Amino acid sequence: MSWKYVPLLILILTAFAGAAGCLSTTFQEVTYGDDGLEISVENSGKPVEKAVLQVTIMKVEGFKQSEVYRKAQYVDLDSGRNAYTIPVDLEPGSYKLFLIVLVGDERKASVIRDLEVAP
């Protein structure tokens, strides 16, 4: 291997090492039931007090989306799996869920999920 590629290799390895810490919080299973929306969040990092969980629900009808719910609330993220219940009543139909976890000014996790509510 030529020595001229060593700095590039070091830069790439440094980028991967830095990005590894960004995946400490992830969304897991999201379901809808009688109690509302059940959201599971996995935190593989240290516990965090007063993280913000933001939930936006859009009803999808054809090519049109309309917002039916939006709320941000403070949550405590313990290490491991965390479960949160969002009390919301949804009519049967198709929805898109936009879920975000913020710690301070930093977005720790975000995901868009499809949800079908049966009649």
Regions found by a protein language model. Give the residues of each.
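Aromatic sugar-binding surface patches on proteins
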Residues: L77-T85
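Secretory targeting signatures
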Residues: M1-T26, I39
